[in-house]
Amino acid sequence: MRTVGVEEEFLLVDADRSRPIPAASRALRVATEWGVAGGQVGAGALVHELQEQQLEIYTAPQVRMASLETELRAWRAAAAAAAAAVGARLVASATSPVAVEPHRVRSPRYDRMAERFGIVTDEQLTCGCHVHVAVGSTAEAVGVLDRIRVWLPALLALSANSPFWQGRDTGYASFRIQALGRWPLSGPTELFGTAAAYQELVERVLAAQVVLDQGMLYFDARASHRFPTVEIRVADVCLDVRDTVLIAALCRALVETSAARWAAGEAPPQVPAVLLRLATWHASRWGVSADLLDPMTARPLPAAEVVGRLVEHARPALRRSGDDGLVADGIARILEHGNGATWQRDVFAGSGRLDEVVSALALVTSGGA
């Protein structure tokens, strides 16, 4: 069975005022003293992200979703404890509900990004959930990328958890995706066809000397340049760990299904990237609270129907992994109660205060509610 690893990015907010604070370096020094910072390939870790108001965790590769959930909870607890030691709280929201002025982590790479991309780097404070699923070769990875691309907007809709930006309601379920769109390379991709074509594209992109390196291929899904995985990057960081595990289970099933179809010589869906951009924008705008676009036709359908088609497409793989029950329960929960964006807006409707939203987010992130 394919292994799965997850990266989650979080905000750091002041424990008293619920405002994002530049505390990552201090929290990581504490974590280093505790022996939980840094990390090696094949092991989980707590690390820096672009801004000082962020921390990132990543898990070791796991086979069982129960083990993945246990590790995610453990790393969230470790990150929350390190944050608390420096007067901060950990928040699982893909954007900051309250106004924030990001403070960039000082590193040569991030300094070069700031010099080249200006305000885009300065204002970039978003938190995603990236799922790594093992593949056997670059050829298989590209075959998978060509076949999962049509399903990624539905994953975004399920995970959407960023309705607020700089102190206002954006109207979007995932404004993180809109913010990411300011980078040169982000969002859906065209069909690649072969590993050679994928590699040629990467080489041409790097030769253009616009992005710094392969790490800046911010596609919704890509072949990882660090690990033998497909990295699915479309999802917002989820408030509820169970939703993170749901997204991970769906990602693995999509990769397994797509790899099998690639191996059998089945052609990928011939959907132009422009239609996938429409579907992604629509999922970003509405999440699961309205229609989604049909993956094959780009016609609007009820969100539950599109998500149901995703599950049906991946059902044999879900059954083989034993994740079908987990996925059914998770999707039913989100369709009934909403995603993280719904939850944030419900809290704001009850309190009228965005700092109360942040405080409530921190409580749930730390497992207190």
Curated annotation (Swiss-Prot):
Biological process (GO), any one: modified amino acid biosynthetic process
A GO molecular function held by the record: ATP binding
Family: Belongs to the glutamate--cysteine ligase type 2 family. YbdK subfamily.
Domain of life the protein comes from: Bacteria
Keyword Transmembrane: no
Range of residues in the leader sequence: none
Keyword annotations of the record: ATP-binding, Ligase, Nucleotide-binding
Role: ATP-dependent carboxylate-amine ligase which exhibits weak glutamate--cysteine ligase activity.
Organism field: Nocardioides sp. (strain ATCC BAA-499 / JS614)
Enzyme Commission designation: 6.3.2.2
Enzyme class: ligase
Biological classification of the source: Bacteria, Bacillati, Actinomycetota, Actinomycetes, Propionibacteriales
One Pfam family of this chain: GCS2
Catalysed reaction equations from the record: L-cysteine + L-glutamate + ATP = gamma-L-glutamyl-L-cysteine + ADP + phosphate + H(+)
Stored NCBIfam families: gshA_cyan_rel (TIGR02050), PRK13517.1-1 (NF010041)
Record-given protein name: Putative glutamate--cysteine ligase 2-2
